[in-house]
A protein has these predicted regions:
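Conserved, structured core segments of small domains
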Residues: 1-100
């Protein structure tokens, strides 16, 4: 039975979206490609940035078979592997309601 998780990607600094350098911008492009591929497979149901006035961060809702799978997905994200200072928070969603 699939399990759903909410994941929050916290950037290394509140101003990251406004002042990322070329290397960070390149890695964010790889990050987007990575999650888009997972969306096309039906694993990432939705993902994207949240425009919080205190600092932009990313969210994702995933559908996986087991909790270990979400850990693997987040640790293999290019921005996490690169060690840029991002942190990840992942929480199970035990009961969801899906629309069409």
């Amino acid at each position: 039975m699939p399990r759903y998780f909410f994941t929050k990607l916290n950037p290394p600094r509140a101003s990251f979206a406004q002042d990322m350098n070329d290397e960070e911008r390149r890695l964010m492009g790889e990050h987007a490609v990575y999650w888009k591929a997972l969306a096309e497979k039906g694993v990432a149901l939705l993902f994207g940035p949240v425009g919080d006035p205190k600092g932009v961060y990313g969210i994702c809702i995933t559908q996986v078979e087991n909790p270990e799978e979400i850990h693997s997905l987040t640790t293999n994200d290019p921005v996490i592997r690169a060690g840029l200072g991002f942190t990840v928070e992942t929480y199970p969603m035990p009961d969801i309601v899906r629309g069409r």
